[in-house]
Amino acid sequence: MKDAIKFVKKCEKCQKHAPLIHQHSEPYHSVVSPWPFARWGLDIIGKLPLAKPGKCFVLLATDYFTNWVEAESYSSVTTNDVISFIWKFIICRFGLPNSLTMDNGTQFNNLKVEGFCEMYGIRVNYSPVYHPQANGMAEATNKAVVGNMRRNLEDKKGAWLEELPKVLWAQRTTKKRVTDESPFALVFGTEAILPTEAGLPTLTTLFAENVEENQR
């Protein structure tokens, strides 16, 4: 931990882009999810530097149980984009959620989104647009994703779109303090084999090799 603190103090990008906390601490109010993918928080990141082909916003969804993140880039985020995102990235991948938490932005808080969610029995919770702490997990994830983007893209400006998959990969495979597990492990039941482990023996690869040998 001491080495990490020293590194961060000497890291120019960390000092420049890491968020400064000016708020007084408040009691922590946990948002409990009864099972994986039952409750999601949705939020919009942007406006980011313009990336080809004209993308400058990211719609982000965070599962409250596993911390798993889904994201898509847009030139602008419309109500139809939100509905399509919920269908494509949440329902079609993880099944119907019990509830969605969003802020009061016009893309979220409207009759179209409410009607779509009502059709599938999804409860919608709205948090004040100027009090995103009420949607705490999504806001914390946004800070992590945007912070990583800024640190990684300081000199690349509009290249954040190419970096988004890497940032999401890091978010999904990094252990979280609350669960002491990575979102990947909670979703798939095993840790991901990272690119840095290519060619190295891991518990997963050793187990797979052992199974293959026993099947011969």
Which sequence ranges carry the predicted segments?
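Domain-scale segment recognizer with a strong primary affinity
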Residues: 11, 39, 68, 97, ...
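Short, contiguous acidic/charged loop-to-helix segments that flank catalytic cores in large enzymes
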Residues: 48-50, 73-78, 133, 155-158
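An active-site-proximal beta-strand-loop segment
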Residues: 36-69, 75
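Eukaryotic intrinsically disordered and solvent-exposed regulatory patches
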Residues: 26-29, 44-47, 55-57, 85-88
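Amphipathic alpha-helical
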Residues: 1-38
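Active-site beta-loop-alpha junctions of metal-dependent nucleic acid enzymes
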Residues: 72-92
